[in-house]
């Protein structure tokens, strides 16, 4: 997993509540179990019409937002069904972090496990950032995990909270599999002890 220290980039504003995982990555892009190749499916139903042509009104198709790295959203972002593809689609598109007022809980956990930083800010702060992003298309902000701050387009700093353990794993680029492999010797020792002490479980 790629370590996350800080990210600076164009803000991609998703100016509505309850953006669900079906909107983030529609079902027809779920035919793979690979992480790669999902960039085209990111917000696919919004980006393309029924003929597969780009919808010009969608922010993802507007020149100012090309190369965006930080999604800005409102309430309950990533709600709906559980699908890691929703996280992988963000990453495939180039998104490093999300700033929102709240999240679907499963999506939030999947983000943390896959190295996509989900930041929660008060709704009033999100509204301020959203107004700036919409007034100045293509403006950028910075997310700093070390100092736990979002730096808005105007230079204002917004502090955020994150679980200390998850923060450390993100800073080190360590996922759950890496963590288990690092403790392989301890796990093997536990299994041996358990077989000796509780052989009926073998």
Swiss-Prot record:
Gene Ontology biological process terms from the UniProt entry: L-leucine biosynthetic process
Catalytic activity: (2R,3S)-3-isopropylmalate = (2S)-2-isopropylmalate
Pfam families documented for this protein: Aconitase_C
Keywords from the named record: Amino-acid biosynthesis, Branched-chain amino acid biosynthesis, Leucine biosynthesis, Lyase
Domain of life: Bacteria
GO molecular function: 3-isopropylmalate dehydratase activity
EC number: 4.2.1.33
Pathway noted in the entry: Amino-acid biosynthesis; L-leucine biosynthesis; L-leucine from 3-methyl-2-oxobutanoate: step 2/4
Residue spans crossing the bilayer: none
GO cellular component: 3-isopropylmalate dehydratase complex
Xref: InterPro entries: 3-IsopropMal_deHydase_ssu, Aconitase/3IPM_dehydase_swvl, AconitaseA/IPMdHydase_ssu_swvl, IPMI_Swivel, LeuD
The protein's assembly and partners: Heterodimer of LeuC and LeuD.
Family: Belongs to the LeuD family. LeuD type 1 subfamily.
Function in brief: Catalyzes the isomerization between 2-isopropylmalate and 3-isopropylmalate, via the formation of 2-isopropylmaleate.
Protein name: 3-isopropylmalate dehydratase small subunit 2
Higher taxonomy: Bacteria, Pseudomonadati, Pseudomonadota, Betaproteobacteria, Burkholderiales
UniProt gene name: leuD2
């Amino acid at each position: 997993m790629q370590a996350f220290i800080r990210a600076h980039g164009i803000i991609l504003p998703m100016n509505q509540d309850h953006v669900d995982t079906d909107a983030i990555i529609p079902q027809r892009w779920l035919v793979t179990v690979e992480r790669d190749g999902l960039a085209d499916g990111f917000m696919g139903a919004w980006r393309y019409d029924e003929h597969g042509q780009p919808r010009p009104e969608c922010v993802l198709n507007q020149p100012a937002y090309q190369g965006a790295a930080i999604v800005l959203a409102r309430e309950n972002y990533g709600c709906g069904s559980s699908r890691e593809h929703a996280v992988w689609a963000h990453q495939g598109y180039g998104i490093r972090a999300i700033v929102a007022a709240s999240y679907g809980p499963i999506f939030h956990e999947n983000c943390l496990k896959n190295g996509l930083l989900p930041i929660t800010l008060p709704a009033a702060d999100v509204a301020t950032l959203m107004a700036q992003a919409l007034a100045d298309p293509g403006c950028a902000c910075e997310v700093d995990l070390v100092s736990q701050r979002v730096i808005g387009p105007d230079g204002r700093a917004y502090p955020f909270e994150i679980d200390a353990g998850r923060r450390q794993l993100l800073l080190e680029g360590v996922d759950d599999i890496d963590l288990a492999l690092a403790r392989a010797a301890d796990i093997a020792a536990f299994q041996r002890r358990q077989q000796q002490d509780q052989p009926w479980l073998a």
